[in-house]
Amino acid sequence: MTYIQERGSTHVYHVNRMSKEEMDHMISLCVHEQPAYCVAACPFKADTKEMLFYAAKGNFKKALAIYEKITPFPMILCNGCTAPCEEKCRLCELGDGISIREVERAIVRYGEPGKRSSVFRIRKKKKAVIFGSGLFPLFLAGELEKKMYPATIYCQEKDYEAYIAAAAPELLESDRKNEVKRLSSMDLSFEFGCSLDLPFIRAKMKEADVVCASEEVAKKLAPEETADAEIMLREQAGIVSGPVRSVMDAAFAAKRAALTVDLLVQNLSPHSNRDSEGAVTTRLYTNMDGMKGSKKIPCSTDGYSKEEAIEEAKRCIQCHCDECMKSCVYLREYKKHPGLLAREIYNNTQIIMGDHQMNKPMNSCSLCGQCTVTCPNGFDMSQVCKSARENMVSTDKMPLAPHEFALMDMLFSNSEAFLCRPQPGYETCRYVFFPGCQAGAIAPDVVTEAYEDLCRRTEGGVALMLGCCGAISEWAGRYEMTEKVNEQLKQELAKLGDPMIIAGCPSCMKQLKESLGAKVTGIWEILKEIGLPGQAKGLEIPVAIHDACGARGDTQTQDTIRELLADMGCTVVNTEYSRDRSPCCGYGGLTAYANKEMADKMTEKCLERSDCPYITYCMACRDRFVREGRESRHILELLYGINAANMPDISEKRYNRLELKEKLLKNIWNEELMMEKKDYTVAYTEDAISMMDERMILKSDVERVLSDYRENQEAIFDEETKELVTRSRLGNVTFWVRFVETEEGYLVRRAYSHRMNIMKRVGQ
């Protein structure tokens, strides 16, 4: 037996197979973090969706805290807001959109203002002055205070209340008092009752690093210059000023002006860092299928009551995109959208020293490609995980443990169990039947019947190739092993005259096409052409079809399978998530080896779609469904009238492959395969067999350990259980066997393994 060398712990190859640019492009396809339609329409980027979420729960304090992030004076802004967000609400497509403005007013009215942070904040050294009153100076004062600028406001008004009244005379008295309280609590310096004549202003300008003013004052200082609408700056005069048109304009201009102040004090261009200002276009996708429209809650002139605001907020559908997560067990289990998960996986590949905590998530993806179909932008999580695995392998940072058993199984299929022969009477053939490694392991009689039928009913000769297509190493990211498999298969195909491959498995079909560039068709296509075998018979009860991951995007295969079932008289029940949207059974991508619990949940998810028996055209799918207790048949079982009806364990699967090879060589090519025979027997308790299958320990591994025991007689005797315990290291794994000796040989009661190496001290 050939073993795979474990990675080196100190030797690192700096060969990245995944670039940051490629990953950034892939991540950009995920729209999960794109702003909701209402949020994107707001020039302040108010998180309206989040506000409505908390308002619907009656948590007006939390909702107000979100609103306070975008403006220092929420009551003034919400009263003057023109609500561009409302027309972008997706509910407008079905009926009435959300009355966002009225809910915001209720949030401001009923919400408890948050306490100012007690965290010590360092004030900036540069000083600012603001001359005049009105909406723009008021909002700008609040924005500069947020940014911790020492700011002095010079105005003609006599006090805070008059200053607020000058800016927002339409406010109700109670609202005005609240905003006065908010303004007076800010860390700002006010000089009331000033005569804002030019000598006074110019004298105060000398005391400041940045000069800001109302439009009225700015015209006095620079009558021939107007402020740039993008940066709110009269550049020649060096005065920051803004418009006097509306509440929305003034508040937005104040935000722009505050950024200008930031840039000026840093000696940077005031035109830089402006890309993210204002309303934006969102790429968010929200599936409205199944949504129902509703009428908005009527609003009186006094606005919503608290209860009415809660009911209106509850109408919000919380626009988001989770199309891929709806059907993908993998993404749901990790509770992360693909963009975030992909970023974490990429970062994991770049770690040189330290723990690679994303190895298990990276290896848990089934690489099925379902997300590419469900995602509106075709985000391919399978490509991310596959590239990450290859990257970890190429940099010698990928542990062998998660995939070693599957890789060893592939090597077994392509060595001891491998067979390649032309049809008797032919040196080269028109076709070669490639049933796939799982078919020979699970239903060897089906392989025999299918091959003999193809030989009888097709012209030009049909060769047979038993082996693995290389998908195992491809999924594991072991690209060098895949190349060796490709080379082996190419050489064998060349001996046969490079025939067309008749694949019995859609994953094999896909792998052989992509890796070898070979001519490949499915056995189902051949049978559709030459007709059903005589023994073909469908089930008498309705059945559900599970489409294999390897057939995703292959409409021809999907249609042919359904046509064959119809020809056999099967009644097919349509299920959710079928054809290209079909989920993975849990075997693909080696999930069943790297994360058994995840794979089991994937299988359960597949079976939730219907209570009917499942018809598959992938033997691995059929095997996993049977193991979950669901009646399942591979379509070839129906076509050839064979019900394998078995659930072979991992050791039986290997034995089935060897036995299939032996029988075919003997019955078709008249060749005898000499099987090794022992002069003793090894028996197993049922608990031992179950345990070994669960822990992926082969009977051949146990027998190798017992063979070593026969040579060295090294074992520990357990006085309590009267069992012998022996061990042996095979490749990268140390196997332990608990057994008793019998007259015929040995009875194995338990077996377990680990990856530690037991060192024996000699002479001590």
Locate predicted features.
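A conserved helix-loop-strand patch within extracytoplasmic ligand-binding domains
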Residues: 520-544
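Cofactor-cradling patches in redox/metallo enzymes
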Residues: 166-174, 438-524, 550-663
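Ribonuclease/tRNase effector modules and their secretory precursors
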Residues: 649, 654-655, 659-764
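Short, flexible hinge/linker loops that cap or flank conserved catalytic cores
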Residues: 32, 120-123, 232, 425, ...
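Ferredoxin-type iron-sulfur electron-transfer modules and their immediate structural context
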Residues: 1-118, 181, 188, 213-364
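Short hydrophobic beta-strand segments
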Residues: 127-132, 212, 430-436, 541-549, ...
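Iron-sulfur-cluster electron-transfer modules
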Residues: 36-39, 49-209, 335-519, 657-666
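Short glycine-/small-residue-rich Rossmann-like dinucleotide-binding loops
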Residues: 215-217, 376, 506, 619
